Amino acid sequence: MNELMKILGQTGQSVTFDQIKIQLASSEQVRSWSYGEIKKPETINYRTFKPERDGLFCARIFGPIKDYECLCGKYKRMKFRGIVCEKCGVEVTLAKVRRERMGHIELASPVAHIWFLKSLPSRIATMLDLPLKDVEPVLYFEKFLVLDKGVCESDQIDSYKNGKKRDQYLLDEIRCEDLLDEYPDAGIDVGIGAEAIKRALSSYDWGIPNDQERELSLAAKEKGLPDPFDYDADVMEGDSEKTMMRKKLRKATSEAARKKLVKRLKLVEAFVESGSRPDWMIMDIVPVIPPELRPLVPLDGGRFATSDLNDLYRRVINRNNRLKRLIELRAPDIIVRNEKRMLQEAVDALFDNGRRGRAITGANKRPLKSLSDMLKGKQGRFRQNLLGKRVDYSGRSVIVVGPELKLHQCGLPKKMALELFKPFIYSKLEKYGHATTIKAAKRMVEKERPEVWDILEEVIREHPVMLNRAPTLHRLGIQAFEPTLIEGKAIQLHPLVCTAFNADFDGDQMAVHVPLSLEAQLEARVLMMSTNNILSPANGKPIIVPSQDIVLGLYYLSLEVPEYRETPDEAVIKDGKIVTAAPPAYSDVAEIESAMLSGSLKLHDKIRLRLPTIDAEGKSVRQTILTTPGRALIAQILPKHQAIPFSLVNKQLTKKNVSDVIDTVYRHCGQKEAVIFCDRLMGLGFRHAARAGISFGKDDMIIPEAKATLVGKTSEEVKEFEQQYQDGLITAGERYNKVVDAWSRCTDEVQAAMLKEISKQVIGKPTNSVWMMSHSGARGSPAQMKQLAGMRGLMVKPSGEIIEQPIIANFKEGLSVLDYFTSSHGARKGLADTALKTANSGYLTRRLVDVAQDCIIVEPDCGTERGLTVRAVMDSGEVVASLSERILGRTLSKDVIHPVTQDVILPRNTLIEEAEAELIEKAGVESVDIRSVLTCDSRVGICAHCYGRDLARGTPVNIGEAVGVIAAQSIGEPGTQLTMRTFHIGGAATRGAEQSMVEASRDGIVTIKNRNVVENSQKVLVVMSRNCEILLTDENGVERARYRVPYGARLMVSEGEAVTRTQKMAEWDPYTLPIITEQAGTVEYLDLIDSITLVERMDEVTGLSSKVVVDYKQAAKGVDLRPRLQLKDASGNVVKLANGNDARYFLSPDSILSVENGAEVNAGDVLARIPREGSKTRDITGGLPRVAELFEARRPKDHAIIAEGEGRIEFGKDYKSKRCVIVKNDDTGEETQYLIPKGKHVSVQEGDFVQKGDPLVDGPRVPHDILKVMGVEALSDYLVNEIQDVYRLQGVKINDKHIEVIVRQMLQKVEILEPGDSTYLIGETVDRIEYEGENQRLMENGDTPAKAMPVLQGITKASLQTQSFISAASFQETTRVLTDAATSGKVDTLNGLKENVIVGRLIPAGTGSVMNRLRSIAASQDRQRVGGASPKAVEDAAE
């Protein structure tokens, strides 16, 4: 073969490359690519169907139509290859050169490239330092541009303009003629069109060599002479545009001018560095892409289908030829100008149709697809053909359940297998001599001869196939199985992998793919086999868990039913006689089985069993255990291991318990045992689910007896609230909230009563089936049972508000017409949401993958000392995520010290496995410092120590693992389960009652932090501190729970008091913010002027009035009203507070006064209250939109304002619509001002002391502020907790490290504060890695390094600003990214995954990372052999 190649020469060479550069092309470059100029708009001859000469499909330019055959047919066959036919001018070669050869069109007049004109910010306009709206009229021949004003003064030209200063040298035609007539000899130079712009661009000294200068300097270099055009020399730099702008920047005073200069300077520097000349943005020549990429295809019926590009090119050629003729004919200026404008528009449409003006449409009124449209969007080149391709050797079919399969198998229909493995079968048939030729083999297969089936069996043996179910939301959506041949036409799937595929058997389809090469088969077997994917990559818990009927079977098997007589565990003996016999004893499982067959023993009876177990030394011992026959059957299939005791299954097995059992088996006995155990467990579950025959009827849904009383009690409460409202004690908003609360509580109580009743086990009656299904985790949830047998409860309007009239009936009792009407509302909204949700969730996943795709494990250890401090997550006193859960599988960044003995329990850099986590938990350590990807110091990618354990394998992570993509999938995959809103189970509201008290969640001893209380007139303690917390400790003083107590709450416990579970410790009104006095005294109103700042509001319903503070519209000039209350003592002096300030209380708008002017008050009394109702009826953004909001780092509406430093609060002078709050530091005397809109409630009072990060105005916090004030660790804490809250609400577990990976990607950029001696500009955002490298270089040279602060970017913005322009272009805003990259001459080093997929190489992760490393070692060895580098340097390069 090689000899043949040598003789024939190679057609298209393939070249290896390491990076791709994108740059503007000069006209010379375009000519060098081209194989000839296209002069005619014709495509093919209508009679002969041969391409026209010099036309768009010309064979002379682009190459022959048939392999090795010229157009006229004079030369045919291989022997003439390379000859150019003298008659038709076609080179005799392969026809595929028509995919590679380009042509060009020489333009009669230059045109601007629309990308650089209209892609904002306009590059051409910025380089000329003109606004875009001045450049456009010049380009499209509406106005003239004065290029050189000659000897005229500016004001002389100004008089000819339209009187505006701005459009610097733009004149319309008439004024231009007048000006030239008036000053004929002044040397004024005016121009119009792209030529003028091109001349303007060339007139600057950019400090970039042009083509001739380049050639001369190259020639000089070859001769060893100094470069005559050395642009780096300071001499040249003297007056280049760049230097002048740097000078201007130093002198710039206003921020706006600085910003404008910086913008232009950056662009100029980009051009200078890339070596592209700005005048190349104006083209003299248009390249024409190869004809096979814009084909003309004959349809049947003699018509042709063509690519839109041909139409667009034809317009350009037509207009260009017409323009040439007009110029030759010396046509009047106005005609030529019009033709030039039309040419400009034609070229615009070719490059980007519709970017300017109306899009050019084809015959069917549809806009033509231009070159830009070919790249853009889901159907563009990037996403349609480069990132996602269709593959051969695949098939798809419906799936059915295959319960008799082993975990690593799948059933493949014979017909399908025969088709998929055809080539393999052909080769085997030939090998065994059944067929002599491939053709004969083909015929045998078509006839389906018996020997074909035998060979198919052999071919398929141990050849894995991959099954995929769309949508593939995470990597477990494609897994490999060994096929077993089955009859029928459906694929059989193992039931245990359904969770991973999210498959069910209601008509789902799956695709089969065959890995062909040996390497592919190897990877499929080692990495993708279903038996290798037992754990979920999202949380490290088993994903191969039984569900539905298997769980039900196991639950039924492990039930323990109470008996008529209460059998004690041991025999009761009185006076030497056995009064009550002990449960019967059995020696082994076989004995039990025979007893059950004979009917003397039931599945759920109590028995004693002598069971062989393995003790700590690994010896086998027998011990007697109290259990049931069912549990003994389960124990029989448990692997024998000392860490797996019988007690693991000697309990009621719910889905969660089964999962824990599988987890334990996997951790202790390894993968193989776990897989075998899972298969056996599945068989057992199915068998007993069938034997149990569990079913339920209407009477199994038991309506609790307590329901009527509970509903009655709540109705009374609601009437009471109504009465309070009528009496004017509460506002309408408060009444609504209280009613909703009461009904929520009632619904919960009914549900609890129903669950209690339904789960009762009565002797002699079987366990309730509905309860079994729900409790075991097989099907149904308490929320659904509540609607069946409890009460449906509150419903939701589509707007998210809760309808205060609940549905008291349940489905068993039946709904009335009104009930049905109320509930149809929310139920429909739920369905509509589901449809929207899927698309949104998919888009979130796509953005996450894009931002994290180049996060790969690159080295074992980066050696950093930094880390994050982690503690258990508490939510209203409950531990939501324990410390051990959060640190499992992470590496320690500091030693863990025992809190009591102060010994080092574990040294730093220990990977925390289950045993270590237990050790830390037992020692009572409160917080642990762990390494995190956020603090990893690796330059590219992440190191293995900072990442920790690979969750899907349970081992330390391997180098080359694509952790970014795994993180993105883990966060995106549950996205579809997250609601769009936080409620809906068939429209039912699940907003719990608003928290209005703190109950102890366990027994313990009370410690109160930040206790600041006063006793009010009712002798109740009222909390005055804004960050008071109640801690519950156990007898060893270890904190077990922590509760936040708000300002104004009534405290019911004292320091050191012992409390019991569910004891009330504090309560408060959840719907108002009180303002409470700390001292006794007489109230005095200040600036509370009737009908200006204070109004009496009448309630229409109750006829009662209340005094409300209003936001006054600016009173008379110079009057600064600040409504407030102050306290005076008996002698009329202002009362002083404990901190020495006067007792003054500022009132924000909407406060309702609770005291009259001159009233006597005691400490702890409420002076005024601010209703909170507005914030609570609005639905809190929940679910998916909340996750997206956090990842996009958006500023929430009505966000909190946080203090940037500590200090005391003072109120400054108010402005028209803002209040001024000053935080003054006592030590430094530094003051920070915050302007707060008047309508917002300021949550601090004058004289309060605030810490850094405390809120001055309540509301959701802004991530950017947290980063700026508190730093990276606080930000990561906030984001991780907020995102986890959303997922926890849905019961989805995701490991923190996945969120950290994404946050790391969001923090890739820094903003320059001081440039030092670097070339950076103030306010510029640069890549963190680049910035650190630059600073290192500066410090090595003894220069001042730059200073910068980290910037938080949303995931979309971060993806668009990655180092790789290929990856960014394939994500979004393709044209903008490519325009940007071209101006700065960007180089893509192909580090991420997407870029490599696009250019068609192995991705640098997984197996590909090894190949990459080997390639770089080989390359550096080559360099060493050539250049003689030291072996040490080569090793460094390989590292």
From Swiss-Prot:
Catalytic reactions on record: RNA(n) + a ribonucleoside 5'-triphosphate = RNA(n+1) + diphosphate
Residues that hold Zn(2+) 2 according to the record: 862, 936, 943, 946
Residues where Zn(2+) 1 binds: 70, 72, 85, 88
Cofactor section: Mg(2+); Zn(2+)
Residues noted as binding Mg(2+) in the record, renumbered to the chain: 504, 506, 508
One GO molecular-function entry: magnesium ion binding
EC number of this enzyme: 2.7.7.6
Binding note for cofactor: Binds 1 Mg(2+) ion per subunit.
GO cellular component terms attached to this protein's record: DNA-directed RNA polymerase complex
Enzyme class: transferase
InterPro entries xref list: DNA-dir_RpoC_beta_prime, DNA-dir_RpoC_beta_prime_bact, RNA_pol_asu, RNA_pol_N, RNA_pol_Rpb1_1, RNA_pol_Rpb1_3, RNA_pol_Rpb1_3_sf, RNA_pol_Rpb1_4
Keyword terms: DNA-directed RNA polymerase, Magnesium, Metal-binding, Nucleotidyltransferase, Transcription, Transferase, Zinc
Alphabetical GO biological process terms: DNA-templated transcription
Top-rank lineage group of the source organism: Bacteria
Subunit note: The RNAP catalytic core consists of 2 alpha, 1 beta, 1 beta' and 1 omega subunit. When a sigma factor is associated with the core the holoenzyme is formed, which can initiate transcription.
Family in the record: Belongs to the RNA polymerase beta' chain family.
Function comment: DNA-dependent RNA polymerase catalyzes the transcription of DNA into RNA using the four ribonucleoside triphosphates as substrates.
NCBIfam families: rpoC_TIGR
Protein name: DNA-directed RNA polymerase subunit beta'
